[in-house]
Amino acid sequence: MKVLVLDNYDSFTYNLVQYLGELGAEVEVVRNDHATVDELLIRGYHAVVVSPGPCTPDESGISLEAVRAFPEAGIPTLGVCLGHQALAQAFGGRVVRHAPVHGKICEIEHDGKTIFERLPSPLTVGRYHSLVVEEGTLPDDLEISATTVGDPASVADGGARGGVIQAIRHRTLPAEGIQFHPESVLTPEGMALLKNFLAAGTRAAVGGIA
């Protein structure tokens, strides 16, 4: 399966590439300012991962456009950290500042669907971020699929059910975002989560969507 990793100039990008490769994917890395979305759409990718990055969605090159265009073309798309924030913003959500969290282990509760299928809940994950998606601004098209446990936050700081939003999912398009890092050693089930994501790409390829 051919997977695009859209690189937002992040040190974690090649950890993602390594994990995806170990899962059998043929991975192509393209930096966020080295191609247009139209150029990438015709390359026959079966799935897309939009990487973490050190900036904001507004500074993430083609990421904002990509997280809409690929799902709208039927290509499963996963945003990680900055990619997750870009997904929320691209569909009308708001990204706000949050107290910096770097290399923090925490537990999240999830809904057990799609990328979280067969994964334990609570799930231990590693967080590295200073921006979050603000719950009250999410459009109806997006649903919250995971939040932190025992980490209260106000709605203004991205609070959701007493915690910070850690994953979102589009209700009708194959697009998901995760605030945490599946490629971090602090996320023991990260490989399993990415395997679930690639399974969606495989189904899309078999169905002739991608």
Locate predicted features:
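Extreme N-terminal starter segment of soluble prokaryotic enzymes
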Residues: 1-4
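Two-component/phosphorelay signaling modules centered on CheY-like receiver
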Residues: 17-26
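A short beta-strand-loop structural module common to alpha/beta enzyme folds
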Residues: 26-35
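Short amphipathic alpha-helix with an adjacent loop that forms part of the alpha/beta core around
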Residues: 36-44, 137-140
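Cysteine-nucleophile active-site neighborhood
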Residues: 42-118, 122-124, 194-196
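Conserved hydrophobic/aromatic beta-strand scaffold that supports enzyme active sites
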Residues: 105-107, 165-167, 177
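Catalytic beta-strand/loop cores that center a nucleophilic Ser/Cys/Thr
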Residues: 112-173
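Acyltransferase
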Residues: 185-210
